[in-house]
Amino acid sequence: MAASAPSNSLPPADSYQLLPEAQKAGAAEDALYEAQVKEIEEWWASPRFAGIRRPYSAADVASKRGSQHFRYPSSVMATKLFNLIREREAKGEPIHTMGAIDPVQMTQQAPHQEVLYISGWACSSVLTSTNEVSPDFGDYPYNTVPNQVQRLAKAQSMHDRKQWDTRRKMSPDERSKTPYTDYLRPIIADGDTGHGGLSAVLKLAKLFAENGAAAVHFEDQLHGGKKCGHLAGKVLVPTGEHINRLNAARFQWDVMGSENLVIARTDSESGRLISSAIDVRDHEFILGIADPAVEPLAETLQSMEARGATGAEIDVFEAKWVKSSTLVTFDEAAVAHMKKEGVSQAKIDEYLSATALDRDMGISRRRALASQFTETPVYFNWDVPRTREGYYHFRAGMEAATKRALAFAPYADLLWVETGDPNVEVAAKLGRAVRSVNPGKSLVYNLSPSFNWMAHGFSEEGLKSFIWDIAKEGFTLQLISLAGLHSTATITNELAKKFKTDGMKAYVEVVQRREKELGCDVLTHQKWSGASYIDGILGAIQSGNSSSRSMGEGNTEGQFD
């Protein structure tokens, strides 16, 4: 007997799947495609995507979706995160969290932190998909952080089910009086540089959404030249290249029909190299030489190498060359040239006003403009100081970082500027600059353990209020990226030292007694792990197995009752 006609209550894609194959060609597939386009256009017009710019159309997305309908739990978590961010941003209050490295830390954070953060640095140094740990140079396999996301998302689900089961055994009165812990906290994950070209970004974004990440941040460093944001040697990519990455992630999630949040991060506050000079938006910050007598650095180094110079000799020469050579922007070279020719300050100010009005003026137009004020051409060459890898020197700083944040803003849900030190005034200036152009746009702040917080002159009150002070300036999402790693190291260091001399006295004093005092549920780790929950499942499947239940008679955790 033939199957009944598909129900009209099903999503269009599901109804299409239930049609006989002979009926799928033609009108039915056209109807599904048109329904998809309409649904996408309405979705993009919702408050969720207010202010978000896309360089592609709803038809572009619909044609890439295929005929299946998927729902991803990470999209629900993304909506949960978006709503929380909007609520806190409106109040000028923070969502502050700590990086977690395992399910234990996730469960201990859940009652107190509203989101969960997973750091690429931590994954690189603690748990990669090849188990080859190393510094945060972004060179671990691209599924490393998505795997950790999946690990913690599954742990969240397990502890949610365990709690649900426990609460169903309570009376209604007991349930109403027993606090509910939301284990299903939105996960924010580190996407590094996207781990390759745009097709790699697409695949990475898909993996993150499938594995449970509500939001992912992507930074504007070069894949292959990536360093931790608090290390030297960072190489930036052109502004437009990073915008393409953000759009690739957004496109992938649009195809999936998921609302995951795109976080744009810039390392241009401290990144002193850039891979290309192709983008005019970067030209005002690219450094060069204004002295025609200076020989090209890369050519000189290659000549030294060809003559048999040692690596140490080349390194010494390069460091000396960079230190002794004055690197300037074109505008600085132009102003110095004008002063040398005796051009009046009024004319110099006229030139600077013109470049300030059009900060995206490219190098060719800047040369043409400068020629209107000088008798001879301005000598400026940004190829001379290029590194052996071909990178250009870049004027890092908050001015460059602010400009990049503004450029990324239309394509991102949140903005993150990696900074070199914790400073309320600097953060406030950045927040105001961004939000004056993008009202309501939330920012991310890394409360980094790479900062020596004790050496920055904070009073106890200032240290305590720092998070809330910058939240008022739009830094809604704040995180100690490596708190989980450092807290594990600290307690293990203390216990290891004391256990060596004091034996079990040390374990009781440092761990077990503290677990009981704090109400830490890992004190009874069998129960914490879900042994009672699994016993319940096995008991439902098979009767008469009470003697083999893990939490039955003989379970030593009864000693803690």
Swiss-Prot record:
Pathway: Organic acid metabolism; propanoate degradation. Residues 157-177 have a biased composition (Basic and acidic residues). It is found in: Mitochondrion matrix. The keyword Transit peptide applies. InterPro entries: ICL/PEPM, Isocitrate_lyase, Isocitrate_lyase_ph_CS, Pyrv/PenolPyrv_kinase-like_dom, Pyrv_kinase-like_dom_sf. PROSITE patterns: ISOCITRATE_LYASE. It catalyses: (2S,3R)-3-hydroxybutane-1,2,3-tricarboxylate = pyruvate + succinate. Pfam families: ICL. Component of the methylcitrate cycle that catalyzes the formation of pyruvate and succinate from 2-methylisocitrate during the metabolism of endogenous propionyl-CoA. Plays an important role for growth and development, but also in antagonism, root colonization and induction of defense responses in plants. This is 2-methylisocitrate lyase, mitochondrial. It comes from Hypocrea atroviridis (strain ATCC 20476 / IMI 206040) (Trichoderma atroviride).
